[in-house]
């Protein structure tokens, strides 16, 4: 076995030390946003297996923006959002003394954006140790709204986090006029564009897509954190049913 020496590695080399995941399927009884991030962050800190109290060294807390906190998004969840400074709320819940509070813009690229930004700041000696957290509690939040249950999830610790990332609107005025905002309305346009490009019939496109998603589901069936850890056949994907609706 090769003896690997790290003596020539700079002290400011970014290293991912620990991580954790959490899937909460308790529906209306699930975690709120802050509880969820706090729980998974505790597990990530423990995963670092540090010999001393790592919490004392975390000087930066970064959080990936939630869908429910997307600016200009006309939805009940946006109107009820009650966490104006989630990085500080999370820091307080973990008894951290982080002096840097970072919150990303909305986007599928935001987790990687945050990783890159934190790594660069560590490299440039701007920060020493960072905690990055993100997740969604929409299943619980929307479920409680549907059942008329209390949804006063909020914490206002004061201050304003630093915002990183581009905040460009994902749709223009014409697209908004036609309701083209949520993925369920936009993705079918992409699918039909691909079908046209490939000169396929609707049936041919469905069969190709079903084969792709069967492979995805096969991978998910082996992942304990998958929302649907079930291996579904192509036939299930080409046969619409009420159980296919996930929102």
Task: Show the residue positions of the predicted features.
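Phosphate/pyrophosphate-binding loops at sites that engage ATP/ADP/AMP, CoA/4′-phosphopantetheine
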Residues: 45-58
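Condensing-enzyme catalytic core mediating Claisen C-C bond formation in acyl metabolism
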Residues: 2-38, 155-180, 187-219
